[in-house]
């Protein structure tokens, strides 16, 4: 989930 959240920032 954390990785997906990072993508959101990108």
Curated annotation (Swiss-Prot):
Enzyme class: hydrolase
Temperature-activity profile: Optimum temperature is 50 degrees Celsius.
Keyword Translocase: no
Biological processes per GO annotation: polysaccharide catabolic process
Enzyme Commission number(s) of this protein: 3.2.1.3
Other remarks on this protein: On the 2D-gel the determined pI of this protein is: 5.0, its MW is: 185 kDa.
Protein name stated in the entry: Glucoamylase
Organism of derivation: Bacillus licheniformis
């Amino acid at each position: 989930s954390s990785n997906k959240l990072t993508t959101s920032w990108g």
